C-alpha cells in the first residue's frame, strides 16, 4: 500500500535544529522553532499553562465527543480575545474551529478553501516552512510565493508584501 510513496523534501529548519544541537558554543541562541526554552534548552511548561490545564481538568465532567468545531464556549472566548467588540463578531461573520496544531490548522483551512473556491490561489511567504507548499498543493490549491525579508537590509521587504 505504501510502496509508491516518495520521500518528502527535508525541512531546512529541522536541519538548523540538528546543527544547533551539535554546536558546542555555550553562547548560541536557538531562534529556529518558535518555542520558549530555558537556559538549559528545556521547553518548560509555563505556570499559567499548568493552571489553565488544571482548571480545565477540575471542571471537566465528560470525555464525550464535542463535535467537529470543538468546544464552542472556548471558541467564543477565543473570538472575543482575537477580535474584541469588532463588528465582524457582532454581525456573526466569524467561525472558529479547533485544530490539531498549526499544520493541522493549515490542512483544515486548505480543504475548506478548496471546497469554497476550487480556483483559489494561496500565497505563502518565501521562505516558509517546508511542508506548507506541499500541504496546500495536496489539497488541490494553486500556490504562489511572496518575499517578506530583504536580505540586503536584514529587514522587512514591505514593497514585496
Region locations from a protein language model:
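Short, basic, glycine/proline-bearing loop/turn elements
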Residues: 1-5, 146-149
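N-terminal "arm"/small-domain region of PLP-dependent enzymes with the aminotransferase-like
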Residues: 2-66, 77-80, 84
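Conserved core of the PLP fold type I
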Residues: 55, 60-161
